[in-house]
Amino acid sequence: MAHEAEAKELLKAYRQFIRHFDGYYERDVAYYETLLKELTLGIKQLVTYRDAHGTLCGYLIYQMQKNDLVVKEAVYMESIALQRMMKEILGDHEAIIVEVSQSEKLEKIFTLAIPKRSAFMMARINSYPLFNKLFNAKAKTPKEAYAILKKPLWLHEYY
């Protein structure tokens, strides 16, 4: 377990992770360079997980908010990477707050997890004809548009 990585490594891990989602933000090396600069301020922290070959297999960005340990972003290739990173940051804290997509089902990995649903995203389709043409769909409402997605959304962004 380490607390450092290069911007290119973080981007590569992110791109591998988002393959499992239909909705996500496009990021580049500059995004991660900005993030790494912010981490030097000490408000947020980074923990990484690497496999036996030294390849980055996941990272967590977390911070203390009042008395709570809050994971701001969790990117991982396998559940073991997530488990080990969470164990690393838990330390003497009693609990960790993590926001994930509904499809990630962390309660299967962490049996004592208490899932809570929270709505936090709003979407607007500016041109239904264009949307329907691009996605070969017949959506008339945002709810219908979301229904055509085959993978969950992953929309966590700071910069």
Where are these regions (language model features)?
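Active-site/acyl-donor-binding loops of N-acyltransferases
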Residues: 1, 72-159
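Amide-forming acyltransferase catalytic core, primarily the GNAT-like/NAT-type
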Residues: 1-80
